[in-house]
């Protein structure tokens, strides 16, 4: 008979989760305590450990175990706390390296059943200790029966730089959904903003122009991109009221906006530098800042004010280490469109504190209800503005990876930073050249996205279905997005007392075969939101909402 789930052994992340909850700590509180104790770590890193996405970093382990009142070996392998080391006499003297290894000490304190754990930890310590080389010269001096070629078995771990990097949009939930699909389950996917799989076709004139120019696209281009595409981008913003004179040299083409975000953070941040990023955010911004050695500091967007940025919160979080402010407008994941008044106030803060403004405007042409998007570059002239945009969403060609960034505003003080951007652009040689030929055509002429977002257009109708159906479910509330193709409903935790929103979404996936991403995956501070992508057609979207309604009804019964 198969054992019940609660008898199965826990992995390290589950033991960590149990101990944290037993201490009554949130991931954010535990991260703060560890940082205060000298073992700097982020909430995202602890979440990664608990989910099993990353292993617990060895140099953080002693502090973690101390704060959770358990041994290191318990967290790593489940070994219970054991008596003093004097109860175990090793058959050979321990070198200083071995004797001082905290993890090894725990292993040596374990009973015979844990000899395998001790063997592994002794091996690790001995490999770092020159004093122990003689121990292995004679097989009779090898009490643990270790192979002489143990160096070939050294575990290859990911870089510690990735410990604070988290991107849940393609994380454990998607991985589970992929396994379920392989088993024959049909999953309704409301997790990724990729128009193509849902029947949104790219404009034919773009495909034709790219095909026609393929003979010209078989070699490298200029590192910043072909001239005609960059010129078309420049003229696009000039027509919108670009304040400062900008040259083609200020435009960089990239393999999607994602590449350019990472490139910017690498060029901008030294270790410990801070970037203000909206909460909730598109998680690549936080991941890129952390990967560059910086610190993502999240400012609040106010749900009661249709997710507009909280200007006072932004200002309160500016420090001497702050290098820039990120503005995602229209916003992913909330679908909010920021007012001109809010944008002007953010510009004023950037100018006052000499900060870089990074404006992610990839959804600037995906707008509803006749609203108008105001580019940040048309409002700022006394600070450096970097505008990010592309064709993935507005022209439904995400697979082309056709994106750009443009520098505007005050640039004299940023010459060294710009030199860094140029160097990094050259290191990746150039962006995908065939896709660069889509840009000039896309920037002018008929904008087919407008037909999709107008009343009775497909995206408009699907937005109405998603928001109205979500608001009809007891305990859910959702603001109406004015841009993009996402909404970010709130869960009333008085009705659904959720502690782990990823686990909640995992239960939804397994029970109802609907895939979405939890709110904390967008660096929201509480487990009470999730993101809905309303790209699927009306029939599939209604089916997903039926399943969601059924799932929440069952949860209400479960929670009583």
What are these regions (language model features)?
Residues 1-25:
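A short, Lys/Arg-rich alpha-helix, primarily the initiator
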Residues 57-74:
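DNA major-groove recognition helix of helix-turn-helix/homeodomain DNA-binding modules
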Residues 154-256, 263, 442-446, 555-560:
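N-terminal small-domain helix-loop-helix segment of the aminotransferase-like
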Residues 440, 456-467, 478-492:
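Conserved glycine-rich beta-strand-loop-beta hairpin in the small C-terminal domain of fold type I
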Residues 150, 243, 315-316, 497-499, ...:
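PLP-dependent enzyme catalytic core of the Aspartate aminotransferase-like
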Residues 207, 378-457, 467-469, 551-552:
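Conserved core segment of the aminotransferase class I/II
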Residues 217-348, 365-379, 547, 559-560:
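Conserved core of the PLP fold type I
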Residues 23-48, 63:
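Short alpha-helical DNA-recognition segment
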């Amino acid at each position: 008979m198969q054992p019940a789930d609660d008898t199965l052994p826990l992995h390290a992340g589950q033991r960590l989760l149990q101990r944290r909850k037993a201490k009554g700590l949130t991931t954010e509180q535990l991260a703060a305590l560890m940082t205060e104790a000298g073992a700097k770590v982020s909430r995202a890193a602890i979440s990664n450990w608990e989910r099993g996405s990353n292993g617990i970093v060895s140099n953080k382990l002693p502090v973690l175990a101390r704060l959770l009142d358990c041994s290191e070996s318990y967290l790593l392998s489940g070994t219970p706390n054991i008596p003093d080391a004097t109860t175990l006499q090793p058959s050979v003297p321990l070198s200083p390296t071995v004797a001082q290894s905290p993890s090894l000490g725990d292993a040596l304190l374990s009973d015979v059943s844990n000899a395998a754990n001790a063997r592994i930890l002794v091996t690790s310590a001995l490999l770092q200790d020159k004093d122990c080389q003689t121990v292995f010269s004679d097989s009779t001096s090898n009490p643990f029966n270790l192979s002489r070629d143990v160096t070939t078995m050294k575990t290859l771990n990911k870089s510690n730089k990735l410990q604070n990097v988290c991107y849940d949009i393609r994380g454990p939930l998607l991985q589970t959904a992929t396994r379920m699909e392989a088993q024959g389950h049909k999953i309704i996917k409301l997790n990724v903003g990729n128009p193509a799989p849902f029947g949104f076709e790219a404009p034919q004139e773009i495909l034709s122009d790219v095909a026609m120019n393929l003979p010209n696209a078989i070699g490298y281009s200029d590192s910043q991109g072909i001239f005609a595409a960059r010129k078309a981008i420049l003229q696009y913003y000039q027509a919108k009221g670009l304040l400062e004179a900008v040259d083609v040299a200020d435009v960089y083409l990239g393999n999607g906006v994602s590449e350019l975000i990472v490139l910017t953070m690498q060029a901008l941040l030294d270790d410990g530098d801070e970037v203000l990023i909206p909460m909730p955010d598109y998680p690549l911004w936080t991941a890129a800042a952390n990967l560059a050695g910086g610190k993502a500091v999240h400012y609040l967007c106010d749900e009661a004010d249709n997710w507009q940025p909280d200007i006072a919160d932004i200002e309160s979080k500016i420090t001497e280490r702050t290098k820039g402010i990120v503005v995602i407008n229209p916003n992913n994941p909330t679908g909010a469109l920021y007012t001109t008044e809010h944008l002007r106030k953010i510009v004023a803060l950037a100018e006052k504190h000499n900060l870089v403004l990074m404006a992610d405007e990839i959804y600037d042409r995906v707008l509803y209800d006749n609203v108008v998007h105001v580019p940040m570059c048309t409002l700022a002239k006394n600070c450096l503005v970097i505008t990010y945009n592309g064709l993935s969403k507005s022209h439904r060609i995400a697979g082309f990876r056709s994106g750009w960034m443009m520098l505007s505003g005050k640039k004299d003080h940023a010459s060294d930073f710009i030199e860094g951007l140029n160097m990094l652009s050259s290191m990746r040689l150039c962006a995908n050249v065939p896709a660069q030929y889509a840009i000039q055509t896309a920037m002018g002429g008929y904008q087919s996205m407008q037909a999709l977002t107008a009343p009775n257009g497909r995206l408009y109708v699907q937005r109405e279905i998603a928001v109205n159906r979500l608001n009809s479910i007891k305990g859910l509330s959702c603001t109406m997005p004015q841009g993009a193709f996402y909404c970010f409903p709130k869960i009333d935790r008085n009705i659904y007392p959720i502690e782990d929103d990823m686990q909640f979404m995992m239960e939804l996936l397994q029970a109802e075969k609907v895939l979405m991403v939890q709110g904390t995956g967008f660096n929201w501070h509480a487990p009470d939101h999730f993101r809905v992508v309303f790209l699927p057609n009306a029939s599939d979207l209604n089916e997903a909402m039926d399943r969601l309604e059924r799932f929440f009804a069952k949860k209400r019964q479960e929670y009583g």
